[in-house]
Structures are given as structure tokens and as C-alpha cells.
Amino acid sequence: MSSSKRARVSAVEAIRGISMMGVIGIHIGAEYLANPSPNIHLVALFDIGTRFSVPIFFFISAFGLLYGQSPTAPFSYRDFLVRRGRAVVIPYLVWSLFYLIHDAYAYGVGFPPLVSLPGILFFGNAKYQLYFMVILIWFYLLMPLWRMLLARMTLPLLAVILLVQIGFDYWSSFDTAFNLYVYGLPEGTLLRALLFYRLNYWVMHYVFIFLLGGYIALHFDAFRTLMARHTTRLYALGIVSLAALLAWYYKLILVDGYTPLEGIYTAHQLSPLGIFYTIGATLALFAFFTRLGTENALGRAFQVLGKHSYFIYLAHPVAITYLLMMIHGTAHVLTAPIALTMYMATLLLTLCMATVMRKIGECVPMINELTIGAKTKK
């Protein structure tokens, strides 16, 4: 792939950091919902305000792949897959094996039968956060298609793709007939697994946000000008999109009688308002972190979080597991203050783990290669 050296975009690193923070929030929120009477506002913080977190990772992944590139330049698909395999496939397999072994011991469930491993790996079911990497691998496998589309991409075509995306995601998430068909399939059949776990590997759920990241990367000078001229409007878009998703969440609970769990399973990132929020949050955060820069304490903090976000994303369930064991071992319920404290502890513990492992990896390069796909520069 031909490329020209472009200036580093610090906002992307910061977005990685805040996205990782959002993912931790979602997973702490899932545990907090075990509380028989959860605070619906804290649930909104953990599980609604963070809904941009997974889709925006696909945005920045595409941005990183296409920034400074030309989609019409010569492209070695083989070399691309080798590089991406080192960066994603190897860590995915390593962490999947780690969690299968760890959980077999920690939860006493035993190691799964060997015949079930292909299915576990295909669907990203070794641990709850790993499905993201499966979808990312599929995006990589289809890279020639994305390059072809981006070489011909226009804003009107991108708008059409957005409309198709909204329609497809709505069908996948909310179509009653389709979902009844899936749940009616016999347990243990391949077709049921392929459809039941569709959110774990169907790239079609996130094509628009991925292409948006690639399109902005290819037209970054124009996008940077737009951010400079319309920063306030981009902030407003982010706020309005969040307010709309929150309003729907509160309506579901306070008016329609949904439980908090039902509310977050409805007002999610694949709903029309969820997609609107993902777009609004993406553009607003890009503008915010571009303006924030790296010459202040907050900016530097997000750069550090972004630098270690990959390891934290992969490792944070370990911290959650043992913090929960401590909480339950002392006969405490996950109340709002404890949940917030647990969130901060998870973030700080995994940040420390990431820093230590990165340092060890500088002495033993294989550590970084296996855990985060980082090759030591000579």
C-alpha cells in the first residue's frame, strides 16, 4: 500500500482512550444491574452514555488504516493480512486461550471440549469483550472491498449507506418475525448459532461507521477545516444526539414500564437513535480532542490512556472478576458508590498492568507481540 508520511493525529489516540473507558463502563454497568434496585441514572451513565464506545473503535481503526493512504494505489492484500494478523489475530488467539484457561480455574467450569473451540473462536465467545476483535478481523479480510468503495465514495453515497445501515440494523435488532425465527431454531444447530451470534461477527452492523472513518481519513484536510469552522456545531450535534438517546431510554423506563435491563437492550448502539448518537459522539469527540491537544494535563492523560487502551480493553475483565470476588466475599451488594469505585479501580489497575507489561515487553519483545501485537522497533 502506498503512503505518504502524515502528521500524527493526537485526537485519534485520545478517542481510543475514552472509548476504552466507555467499554469498561458498559461492563461494570452489566454487573451493577445485578443490584435488585439499580439507580436508573447511573445505569444511563454506564450503559447509555457509553454506547458510542464499540462503534467508534471501528471508526478509528478505519481512520488509522487509511490516513495518509490512497485507495487507488497498489495494494498488497497478502502483506496487509500478515501485518494485521500480527496486530490482531495473534493477540486474539492468545487472549482467548488465556480466558478459557483462567475462567476454567476461576469459576470452576473446566476447559471447554476441544470440539467446541472452533465455534468459540469463530464467534468470539471466549470472553465477553473479544467479539469486537472478530468483527475487526472480518473488516480486515474484506479490505479490498472497502478500498474499492472508498475510492468511489461521495457524501451522497455515504448518506445512502447510512440509510441502508439504519434499516439493516433495525431489522436485525427489532424485527419480531426474524428474531422469533432465530429463537425457534433447534438448540445446537449450526444455523441457530450463525444467526444467534450474528452481533459477534456480522460486519454489516458497522459498515457505515467504518467507511466514515476511512472517508474522513482520506479527506482529513477538509475535515480539519470543517472542525475548525464548526466546532460549536459539532459539540451541539454530540449533545443533541446523546440527549435524544437518553430521552428514549427514560421514556422506555418511566413511561413504557421497561426494566433498566430491558431499557439498555432496546436503546442500544444499533437502534436508529443509537446510530445517530455514535455519529454525533464521534464527530464531537474528534473536534474536542483536536482542540484539547496534548500540551495540558488532561490532553496528556488521554494520550496515556490511548497508548495503553488495547491492553486495557483486552485485560479489564480480569480486574472486574477479582474486584467482584472481593465485593461479594465481603457480602456487599454492588451499590452505586461501590460500582463507581469499582469502575475507577478497574481502570487504574489495568492501566498499571498495561504499563508494567509494556515495560517487560521492552526487555522480552515476545510479551508485547503476543499480548498487543506490537513489534519492538529496532
Where are these regions (language model features)?
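Hydrophobic alpha-helical segments with transmembrane-like composition
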Residues: D103-Y107, V115-F178, Y197-L211
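Alpha-helical transmembrane segments and terminal signal-anchor/GPI-anchor hydrophobic tails
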Residues: A222-A301, H308
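Transmembrane alpha-helical segments and their boundary/interface "anchor" motifs
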Residues: D47-P55, Q69-H102, L114-Y128, F139, ...
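Interfacial loop-to-helix transition and helix-capping segments at the boundaries
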Residues: A44-V54, L121-I135, T176-I209, L245-T282
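Membrane-interface helix-boundary motifs at transmembrane edges
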Residues: K5-V9, S70-V82, W146-P156, L218-R233, ...
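Functionally critical transmembrane alpha-helices in membrane proteins and complexes, commonly lining
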Residues: S10-Q69, V88-S96, A126, N200
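Aromatic-anchored segments of alpha-helical transmembrane domains
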Residues: M21-I28, L162-F174, I239-L252, P317-V318
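C-terminal "closing" transmembrane helix and its immediate cytosolic amphipathic cap
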Residues: L150, T290-Q303, A319-K378
